Amino acid sequence: MLKLLLLTLPLLSSLVHAAPGPAMTREGIVGGQEAHGNKWPWQVSLRANDTYWMHFCGGSLIHPQWVLTAAHCVGPDVADPNKVRVQLRKQYLYYHDHLMTVSQIITHPDFYIVQDGADIALLKLTNPVNISDYVHPVPLPPASETFPSGTLCWVTGWGNIDNGVNLPPPFPLKEVQVPIIENHLCDLKYHKGLITGDNVHIVRDDMLCAGNEGHDSCQGDSGGPLVCKVEDTWLQAGVVSWGEGCAQPNRPGIYTRVTYYLDWIHHYVPKDF
């Protein structure tokens, strides 16, 4: 995915906001390991055609015909569904690909840049997938689920394994466990080293923080799922969105909070299938 490596903030009134650096998007798992077997059967790879159908973002199957991802993954450059393909759960990228076509791309109408939130989008597959033990939608959480601070969750993807370090062949799906960090504390962490006023919220209500030094998502993981186990059921808590660097001190990964957008999701995606 395209998780943002560095933060860009607008000027607000008379405040001068020192940004951590240029806006870049997230690409990979740092501090994790290969995800073996049929774990994470909802993970998908989004592909764009260059000299071949190349992975550019992650996503999650939330219905047999719908994929959830980040809006910054499918912005103006790839908004045409004919330019996107979806590969269902694969252990290794590009190994016996069976790419699925997309009939519709829907980005949230409030999305502009990731720092302003609403970094969420839906892709409708041309045809529904066949559900199995290896390919299965991830349940979405109830609106009441808060995912309290300290909850241990998992993020998955095929992105970079460190800042500027690409995932090497054979490009295995990676996983890493990350703790949820309460939004206020996460916001305080992001203010460290900046001259941004404390009254300016970097981490917004529709965002969720997770990760610690050495464990994080990175470039190429954008759009992928952050999942947490609640009473023996995996629920998708977040969508990989942005961050400053990968697994850096005081810079947790930032995810779009799924519960914030349940009404919008279900305006398009049936709850039952």
Curated annotation (Swiss-Prot):
Q: Which domain of life is it from?
A: Eukaryota
Q: Which keywords does the record carry?
A: Disulfide bond, Glycoprotein, Hydrolase, Protease, Serine protease, Signal, Zymogen
The Gene Ontology biological process annotation of the record reads:
negative regulation of blood coagulation; proteolysis
The residues that carry sugar chains are 49, 130
Tell me the first and last residues of the signal peptide. 1-18
Q: Name one GO cellular component term.
A: mast cell granule
Q: Propeptide positions, renumbered to this chain?
A: 19-28
Per the database record, which ranges form the Peptidase S1 domain? 29-270
Task: Give the Enzyme Commission number.
Answer: 3.4.21.59
Under PROSITE patterns, the record lists: TRYPSIN_DOM, TRYPSIN_HIS, TRYPSIN_SER
Q: If you read the UniProt record, what top EC class would you report for this enzyme, in one word? A: hydrolase
GO molecular function (one): peptidase activity
| Catalytic-site annotation from UniProt | 72, 119, 222
- Record-annotated disulphide pairs: 57-73, 153-228, 186-209, 218-246
Q: Which InterPro entries match?
A: Peptidase_S1_PA (IPR009003), Peptidase_S1_PA_chymotrypsin (IPR043504), Peptidase_S1A (IPR001314), Trypsin_dom (IPR001254), TRYPSIN_HIS (IPR018114), TRYPSIN_SER (IPR033116)
Quote the catalytic activity from the record.
Preferential cleavage: Arg-|-Xaa, Lys-|-Xaa, but with more restricted specificity than trypsin
Family classification: Belongs to the peptidase S1 family. Tryptase subfamily.
Which PANTHER family does the record match to this protein? CHYMOTRYPSIN-LIKE PROTEASE CTRL-1-RELATED, TRANSMEMBRANE PROTEASE SERINE
Entry function:
Tryptase is the major neutral protease present in mast cells and is secreted upon the coupled activation-degranulation response of this cell type. May play a role in innate immunity.
Mind telling me what this protein is named?
Tryptase
Record organism: Mus musculus (Mouse)
